Amino acid sequence: MGDIAKGKKIFVQRCSQCHTVTKEGRHKVGPNLWGLFGRKTGQAEGYSYTQANIEKGITWDEETLNVYLQNPKKYIPGTKMNFAGIRKKRERLDIIAYIKEATSK
């Protein structure tokens, strides 16, 4: 498991421009991530996903999010997430720990 505090710092630097994590958070360029864990791809209510995201059909958990964050466009070709990915596994695990904690309060 990752470090939540480190994950929050990385999230603020690299993810918060496009995503929110609170229950009342709005969609930005990317969807609000509240309730992400256990949800299928392309299912955040009120967000306009690409067909590729909708059809991927995986359920978000630590493992799938880790693979996705390493290289989003490779994992879901056709995603509109304009982000190259996070190479360092430790950073991905920290972000995942933060997202899991922040989106389940």
Swiss-Prot record:
Amino-acid positions noted as binding heme c in the UniProt annotation, renumbered to this chain: 15, 18-19, 81
CC per GO annotation: mitochondrial intermembrane space
Keywords, alphabetical: Electron transport, Heme, Iron, Metal-binding, Mitochondrion, Respiratory chain, Transport
Pfam families: Cytochrom_C (PF00034)
Compartments in which it is found: Mitochondrion intermembrane space
Post-translational note: Binds 1 heme c group covalently per subunit.
Keyword Transport part of the UniProt annotation: yes
Matches recorded under InterPro entries: Cyt_c-like_dom, Cyt_c-like_dom_sf, Cyt_c_1A/1B
Highest taxon listed in the record's lineage: Eukaryota
Family per record: Belongs to the cytochrome c family.
The protein's name in its UniProt record: Cytochrome c-a
Encoding gene per record: cyc-a
